[in-house]
Amino acid sequence: VFVSAHPDIILKMGTKDVLYRTRHMEWGGDTRLYASPAQLRRELPVSLAPGKVRVLKQYRGNGGDGVWKVEPVGTDGPARAASLLRVRHAKRGSREETMTLEAFCARCAPYFAGQGRMIDQAYQERLPEGMVRCYLVHDTIAGFGHQAINALFPAPPGAPPGKAPQPGPRLYHPPTESAFQALKRKVEQEWVPEMQQLLDIPKARLPVLWDCDFLLGPRRPSGEDTYVLCEINVSSVAPYPETAPPYIAAATLARLQEAVRRRRPASARK
């Protein structure tokens, strides 16, 4: 039976755990993992050092559900249980709230049910410059999506938090789009092979269709852009660019042909 991705591969690539497991790659950064509510209460105050803004994400979820921008109110020393935080849920329609650190940890408690956990990443200040989604068929980019206004987009300067715009449409581009060629080279030639080695995923077991979202990171001294991995999606990757179907068809055919070949008696194989 052919499927786009084996459940084991989905667990390796398609949960927020991948952000922690690949944190030492070039697309990674200051990323932490909380395996329990107690660990969250104990270590989040350290992560929220004065002036730090963080993004916390539940282990599995989509549509911004369980993704929170968190920052301390004021910079007067380490955060404590009673310290105030500004928090904003990435789910569409959410507004910024102010609550204590203890109240926020209590709100996150359901995310730890079963095998649940939370990932903690540094907030990327260049988020207002948009998010780029790379659509891949196995290890080849088949198109791009660019979303100028995405979840957690800030309010205009001087405006109250409630004026922050809601996410806008994603515009699709072919794999030849000139604006994304530097990113394409990084993804195909460096990052996907490194991820495969790190997670022990051979090319034949990569999903037929998957995507990875990138935000712009700090510029290098040379002015070159860097990119930070925001998420990998392996399940229900749709819609996608109109350039993707030929890649999907070719990859699917190759997998089916290989499955048929393996089922033949050894004497009949060529």
Positions of PLM-derived features:
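Conserved N-proximal alpha/beta basic substrate-recognition cap immediately N-terminal to
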Residues: 1-47, 62
